[in-house]
From Swiss-Prot:
It comes from Drosophila melanogaster. Component of the small ribosomal subunit. Part of the small subunit (SSU) processome, composed of more than 70 proteins and the RNA chaperone small nucleolar RNA (snoRNA) U3. It comes from the Eukaryota. InterPro entries: Ribosomal_eS6 (IPR001377), Ribosomal_eS6-like (IPR014401), Ribosomal_eS6_CS (IPR018282). Transmembrane segments: none annotated. Belongs to the eukaryotic ribosomal protein eS6 family. One of its GO terms (cellular component) is cytosolic ribosome. The modification Phosphoserine is found at residues 233, 235, 239, 242, 244-245. GO terms for biological process: cytoplasmic translation; ribosomal small subunit biogenesis. Residues 223-248 have a biased composition (Basic and acidic residues). This is Small ribosomal subunit protein eS6. The keyword Ribosomal protein applies.
């Protein structure tokens, strides 16, 4: 079985191939997310604690968190589920995934170093790979440098150096800070609120005018009906009087 071990503190990961079955028994019947003491893997692993992050079986099917079996199952997956990437909007698909329990049929096991031991492991804990990009969101930059709301975040942005080309001076590039509160942002917000209030007032006035117009139209229609009723009653009286005069 191969062990793909990553160490977030240095940003490194390394693939180890373990042939001895006895060394791997410490991982068997363990679930994803469980912490394992790695002393049995060798002297250089003494004191290390590893968390099981996932893995693939010998046919390439991935482990899925929450599936409490060591075998393979077919699940109906949709957007947001692990082990599946939808190609169309709203698409669902039945996919074969492996349970979250480790057994001997695993090909690769993904592990994360939670606690470093006594010795360094070459290529994993002795070298540090610097992050290519720094944080972009204003709140995360504040969290990284422990800044208050009064501090200017723009001075603390991690700039990325660009190599010099065509006999030009080397430059650096900074990301656009997201969710940064500036006077322009506040101005736009106040404008949005003012427009919303203006629309509300205009809507209230329009509804009041419509209510007045509705009352006026009802009065007019009522007056028309009463006028028509009077005319009908007057014409009926006239017809009755003409009939009675003819009889005489």
């Amino acid at each position: 079985m191969k062990l793909n071990v990553s160490y977030p503190a240095t940003g490194c990961q390394k693939l180890f191939e373990v042939v001895d079955e006895h060394k791997l028994r410490v991982f068997y019947e363990k679930r994803m997310g469980q912490v394992v003491e790695a002393d049995i893997l060798g002297d250089e692993w003494k004191g290390y604690q590893l968390r099981i992050a996932g893995g693939n079986d010998k046919q390439g099917f991935p482990m899925k968190q929450g599936v409490l079996t060591h075998g393979r199952v077919r699940l109906l997956l949709k957007k947001g589920h692990s082990c599946y990437r939808p190609r169309r909007t709203g698409e669902r698909k039945r996919k074969s995934v492996r349970g979250c329990i480790v057994d001997a049929n695993m090909s690769v096991l993904a592990l994360v170093v939670l606690k470093k031991g006594e010795k360094d492991i070459p290529g994993l804990t002795d070298t540090t790979i610097p992050r290519r990009l720094g944080p972009k969101r204003a709140s995360k930059i504040r969290k990284l440098y422990n800044l208050s709301k009064e501090d200017d975040v723009r001075r603390f942005v991690v700039r990325r150096p660009l190599p010099a080309k065509d006999n030009k001076k080397a430059t650096s590039k900074a990301p656009k800070i997201q969710r940064l509160i500036t006077p322009v942002v506040l101005q736009r917000k106040h404008r949005r609120i003012a427009l919303k209030k203006k629309r509300q007032i205009a809507s209230k006035e329009a509804s009041a005018d419509y209510a007045k117009l509705l009352v006026q139209r009802k009065k007019e229609s009522k007056a028309k009906r009463e006028e028509a009723k009077r005319r009908r009653s007057a014409s009926i009286r006239e017809s009755k009087s003409s009939v009675s005069s003819d009889k005489k």
